[in-house]
Amino acid sequence: FNLSLKNYIRDKINDVRESYPWEKFYITNYHQFIKSEANNYNLPIKGLTSYTDINFFEPVKNHIKKYKAIFIDEVQDYQTEWLEIITKYFIYEDSEFVVFGDEKQNIYRRPLDENKEPVIKTIAGNWNKSLNASKRFTSEIGKLAMKFQHHFLESKYTIDDMVVLDNPILDFEQRNIKYANIGTEASTERIFNIYKGTCKKYCLNPADITILSGTADILREVEYFIKTQLKENTTTTFETKEEYDKSKVETHSKNNFEERINTIRRYRRNHFSIKTGTAKLSSIHSFKGWESHTVFLIIEPHRSDSIQDFESVELI
């Protein structure tokens, strides 16, 4: 479901100084997994409903290859039916089935239980909340995150009991937290100039930079300025301005236009990597950017005409 996450997970495993048998790892996202398994057993995918049909694999249930261990990250993004399909057809009774999630990142409005936590019908008992010590955040960002949760999310979710270490193991030296209130009508050029000025002031390497926003609309324009004004390459999870404009001219309906744009985005997300040596631009849905040395977060006003129309405090 989160296409770029699979490359990130592979990179993190690769960072461990061990010789892993990569043929034993199958790292993918939900929809690609189901599509691949359906192809393996000659089952036709009949639209999005096939991905939520808990009996979809019933005709071939006795032939399906099962897994001794399945790990799911960002499980708050998953529909309940997806988890039922996985546990019904792809694990043994004694398989290891582990999910990781954070209901405060519930950007797709999945249902929560009476404890305001993700609903995982296939796993009994309470959530294990022992992973509460931040390994990445410095005290400055950790304290900011806690204040943000209490102010905006306390009425909707159970707030983290997070331990913020003064010297986290994965300390990425994120020390400066700066704000620029540029109003709702600020031009892309002004945002770009703030970016350029900050890079110059702090001598930032483009490889250490991630630019995030809720949608691709403004990121596309910022990326265009970086390429044309700074003459720098970039890595994105979305189409370029040139591709966007060309698609508008060449397609003759809104559906065809959106289909072409979504095809480009799927390809970019599938090949997105944090180890590119260039500045990275992404929607928060595809990459959260916390492993970057420097993150520029653009909080846009509500846009009803966006291809992906999201406005959510969970994104921030």
Kindly label every feature range from the protein language model.
Residues 23-115, 289:
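Conserved helicase NTPase motor core
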Residues 1-2, 79, 215:
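Helix N-cap/beta->alpha junction signal
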Residues 1-13, 28-32:
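Conserved Walker A/P-loop ATP-binding site and its immediately adjacent core
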Residues 126-130, 155-193, 204-213:
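Inter-lobe coupling/hinge region of RecA-like P-loop helicase motors
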Residues 85-173:
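Conserved RecA-like helicase ATPase core segment
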Residues 18-26, 124-127, 172-176, 274-278:
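A short helix-to-beta-strand connector/capping loop
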Residues 116-143, 148-150, 196-314:
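Core RecA-like ATPase module of SF1/SF2 helicases and allied nucleic-acid translocases
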